Amino acid sequence: MSEKFKRDKKDRVLSIRDLNISFKTNYGIVNAIRGIRFDLFKGETVAIVGESGSGKSVTIKTIMGILDSNGMIDSGSIIYNYTDDNGNEQSVDLVQMSQKEIRYKFCGKKIAMVFQDPMTSLDPTMTIGKQIMEPMLEHQHVSREEAKKRTIELLGEVGIENPEKRFKQYPHELSGGMRQRVVIAIALACDPDILICDEPTTALDVTIQAKILELIKRLQNEKNISVIYITHDLGVVAKVADYVAVMYAGRIVEK
């Protein structure tokens, strides 16, 4: 863990303990996650590193409430500490909630995600502005005028020039780097506590990769967001992580 980041128990946002997840397959039960444990603190960056099939994505899908239908949480807990809409401190075990309830209550609002390929993350039939406004209108109960104003501000915050013009454009009219900035803007639309970045630079060229990582770090510092990176790129880890969890065959084998 980076010496620059000091963990404080009162700032713990997420606490995963002894999580075990299996999948029903045609060949029997497959144990995908085997007793993993890690914490995420306010303003911290945790990188989960591992090869394909190590269990990184299954872990994140469980947090987001989007675990595949043949997946089963056998044991363990995922304690999420957050502040509700009335300003009250709350603590909930996501394992005890239905996936539908997690998605409705937290996904896109308190816990947001940046996917690796912006072209598959964005709807080609909707303007950039509408896609950023959508989570605000759904979760924050603001007027369309307020959502539009905040969207234009967000486009500026993520480094997109002439945001009023971009608001009306479609994804195919933007470069790959700009599309990824839009995906980040969508993720930040409702001021989440946790931002999960799933290989956010894989689909981009090297020069754009560095700019996107710098952007996420700047926004994290400005908004005091906790970030989880899912990656196999140790170069990314070296640049951004305060804490690293290495996964292999469903276990965290090194921290």
Regions found by a protein language model. Name each.
Residues 77-105, 143, 214:
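ABC ATPase NBD Q-loop/coupling interface
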Residues 189-193:
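A short, proline-enriched helix->beta-strand linker immediately N-terminal to the Walker B motif
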Residues 49-51:
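The feature captures the beta-strand-to-loop junction immediately N-terminal to the Walker
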Residues 9-13, 22-35, 66-72, 84-91, ...:
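A short, flexible loop at the N-terminus of ABC-type nucleotide-binding domains that lies
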Residues 169-174, 178:
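Conserved ABC ATPase signature
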Residues 146-165:
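Conserved ABC ATPase "signature" region
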Residues 204, 208-255:
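P-loop NTP-binding/switch modules centered on Walker-like glycine-rich loops
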